[in-house]
Structure formats: structure tokens, C-alpha cells
Amino acid sequence: MNTGLQDAYNLAWKLALVVSGRADASLLDSYEAERIPVAKRLLSTTDRAFVLIVSDSRVAGLLRTRVLANVAAFAMRFDRIRKLAFRTISQIGIEYRDSPLSEALARWHEGAPRAGDRFPWLRIKLQPDGPVEDLFAKLDDKRFHLLLFGQPALSAEIRGLRDLLVTHVVPSDPANDKELARQHIPQPSFYLLRPDGHVGLSGTQLDVAAVSGYVSDRLRMHAAK
């Protein structure tokens, strides 16, 4: 079910942009580029599991009832394994790093979100004196979102992208810094999130031309005059 939901979501936001005239139909080509590799990995895994489950050999029976059950019970004692299992089953760990929609302007240290990854769930302050909020609850899944960390706000909106892009400047704050460190998000950095929450473009200091060029190139549209 999770796979079907992700298939639908991946196609839905792209189709919405095309139907509304904000993107060229070529954007839809990225659906197969992103989702077919996921489907192949899933089928490979489920095929192996199915063979083990239906096999009537004694070895397979021992693996099912003794070995795998004990190994799973032991592994679930560890927080890291539980988190990995959750990400695998929920499929929020799926990434599109090889997608034509993924571009990185900087190389991050191990653990940092990369272009193509689903951006991590954060609870942060979006205003200096504001409350701690759920970042994903603030995101509009009909537009792109530009997240700025450890750098000042834009002096003006990125020209021509008002209807496609929302900018969020995350203020410097001890609680924010702790949350960003927990998710290995470097500062300064910027992340351009697609409507589905995956990272489309990432870098250190904001490059306005790169952001504008990314949207124009991937959506095959021209900035509004």
C-alpha cells in the first residue's frame, strides 16, 4: 500500500503543475525515472521473501520458525535497527539521488540530507519569537519550498517564482541548532524541496541564479515577466 501511495503522490504533484500550466509535460518523464527503480528493488525483495515463506523444505522451515524470529527479536532491541525497520516499511527512506530532478551544489558530510533524499522531519522555530512547529505541517504540497539555514533572508523574492516557490528562513536559535545538529543539517545551507518533500537542489550559501535556473530547467518554463 505504501508503494502505491508513493506512486500516486509522485505523479500527482507533477501532473498538477502540468495541468495548471506551470510546468511542461516533459516533467512527467521523471516519474518512471524515479519510481521504476523503486519497483524493481521491491519486487526483488518480495520475491525472495515469498520463496522463503512458501518453501516446504526443512531448512526454510527452520529459518522461518527459529532463526529469523530470534534474530528479529534480538535486533529490535536496538534503537538504530528499529528506526531502520520503520524507514524501510514506511518507505520514507526511499531516495531519488539519481533522478534528473536532483542536483547538489555542495558535498555534504555523512548523514546530511542529500539531493534526492526525503527531507527529514523537523520541529523548529520558523520565527525568532515563535513557537516550535512541525516543518512538514507548514509545507504546501502544490509548490516548491526553499529552506535557508544559517544565513539571512532574501532581500527580494526570486523573480518570477512567486507562484511556485515559498521561502522559509530558519532563525538562529539554540533549540533550532540542536534540532538541525540531530538531523546532521549543516549551516550555512539551503535546501530546495519539491512539493513531495524530497530535496531537489541543495547547497551552502544561497545561489539565487541556481535556484531560478533549476526551476526553469526542470519545469521547462520561463520566469514570469
Where are these regions (language model features)?
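Helical substrate-recognition/capping region of FAD-dependent monooxygenase/halogenase enzymes
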Residues: L17-K225
